[in-house]
Curated annotation (Swiss-Prot):
Protein name (Swiss-Prot/TrEMBL): Salt stress-responsive protein YocM
Key words of the record: Cytoplasm, Stress response
Disulfide bonds: none
Database matches in InterPro entries: A-crystallin/Hsp20_dom, HSP20-like_chaperone
Protein family (similarity comment): Belongs to the small heat shock protein (HSP20) family.
Protein species of origin: Bacillus subtilis (strain 168)
Keyword Phosphoprotein carried by entry: no
Length: 158
């Protein structure tokens, strides 16, 4: 069986019948235990061919201390120049793009993340302090100082 032709047929079927095509083909009870490890059991569900990508990518840890909040965003294979951070007050947007150096038809197996991504990170009200970012070893560290503001005296009325 020619894998490339099968892949093209599957992509065509998904485009014609929408993103839920494979969910309609396979029953929920047909999933085996090894298919329920956090990944979708349906072919191509993690990489939408229309450019939306995997909503869970990139994975992220959040560390909340007394003075700051640190976001650790895991971007294996990405370089600093592939990634951009935008601050919109109530949220951050981390986006990037990475391309393969190989021709698509030369892949026998392809599990790496290629193409573009965008992750929106909501921020709580007290996160409006100084921000800085470091990219090291495929991990983007974004640190935001907590801004608790100045204490205000509240007068107690009689």
């Amino acid at each position: 069986m020619d894998f490339e032709k099968m892949k093209q047929w599957m992509e065509f079927a998904q485009q014609m019948y929408g993103g839920d095509f494979w969910k309609q083909v396979f029953d929920e009870d047909q999933k085996t235990p090894f298919m329920t490890n956090g990944q979708s059991p349906f072919p191509f569900a993690q990489q939408d061919q229309r450019g939306k990508g995997d909503a869970s990518f990139p994975s992220m840890d959040i560390v909340d201390t007394v003075a700051e909040v640190q976001f650790l965003i895991y971007l294996p294979g990405y370089r600093k120049q592939d990634v951009h951070i935008l601050s919109y007050g109530d949220y951050l947007v981390v986006k990037g793009q990475r391309f393969s150096y190989f021709n698509e038809q030369d892949f026998r197996q392809k599990e790496g993340k290629y193409g573009s991504f965008e992750k929106k990170i909501p921020l709580s009200d007290h996160l409006h302090g100084k921000m800085n970012a470091i990219f090291k070893d495929g991990i983007l560290y974004i640190t935001i100082q907590k801004d608790e503001g100045q204490a205000k005296t509240i007068v107690i009325d009689d």
